[in-house]
Curated annotation (Swiss-Prot):
Protein name: CB1 cannabinoid receptor-interacting protein 1
Molecular function as annotated in GO: type 1 cannabinoid receptor binding
GO CC, alphabetical: plasma membrane
InterPro entries assigned: CNRIP1
Amino acid sequence: MGDLPGLVRLSIALRIQPNDGPVFYKVDGQRFGQNRTIKLLTGSSYKVEVKIKPSTLQVENISIGGVLVPLELKSKEPDGDRVVYTGTYDTEGVTPTKSGERQPIQITMPFADIGTFETVWQVKFYNYHKRDHCQWGSPFSVIEYECKPNETRSLMWVNKESFL
């Protein structure tokens, strides 16, 4: 096992396919468990891009709400300080969220040697007939996380989450 990095920076980007369209979120205030809701469309595919710093870290998959998304190494950035992985998250068969409700979905990403990244996203899944609702709110390019691995190498503490 290598040295435990002091900080791990990772970003997760979602883009609806086939046109690499933006994903939106809405600020809900304190009405629900979290103040931001990510809007997703059922029966759709999303490109998932994960960037990780330091570039020595390796990951094979991300679980989004229990759906395992295999990640493929895409590149190491030219300056060599980040590594980029991509995969496809499919919402086929996901039940639309009822009106006035939100769904917490668990996000997990197990890293070799340093533990598992875990967080929860508050999501609203819309069906095709309400697809225009998915585009109300603010688009985001990426969700960035600053994490600290714990000493037992079992999980990472999330210090900061930013929607950019």
